[in-house]
């Protein structure tokens, strides 16, 4: 429970400047990965209201994205711009810079699940240029 509280605090402080102000980030799970020394898993949902986007950032983690509702537009630096709908996935490697992340709709919300594999205690989100 202490780890989940820390994750909530971390997401609350880092999420504000990195995600659209009105994006809702909900932590679901924070768990040490005992089979992978020094690593932990973190699972969150992100809900973008209509037209919302996030700032350029990186995760310094493996990030596995699964779209639950709506449509999102994603791109990492040097990668292809993709539009994803429910059931589609997106991957960000630890060294990727996430340059585009936004709701494709100006009228409907979008929601996606993200599972991170990261170093224990490392920040989830880091601003980038």
What role is predicted for each listed range?
Residues 38-43, 62, 79, 95, ...:
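Extracytoplasmic
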């Amino acid at each position: 429970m202490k780890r989940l509280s820390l994750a909530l605090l971390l997401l609350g402080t880092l999420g504000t400047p990195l995600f659209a102000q009105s994006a809702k980030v909900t932590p679901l799970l924070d768990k040490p990965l005992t089979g992978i020394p020094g690593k932990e898993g973190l699972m969150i949902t992100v809900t973008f209201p209509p037209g919302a986007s996030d700032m350029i950032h990186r995760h310094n983690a493996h990030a596995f994205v699964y779209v639950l509702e709506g449509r999102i537009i994603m791109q990492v630096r040097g990668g292809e711009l993709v539009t994803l709908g429910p059931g589609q996935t997106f991957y960000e490697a630890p060294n990727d810079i996430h340059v585009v992340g936004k709701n494709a709709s100006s009228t409907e919300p979008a929601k996606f699940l993200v599972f991170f594999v990261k170093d224990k205690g490392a920040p989830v989100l880091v601003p980038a240029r």
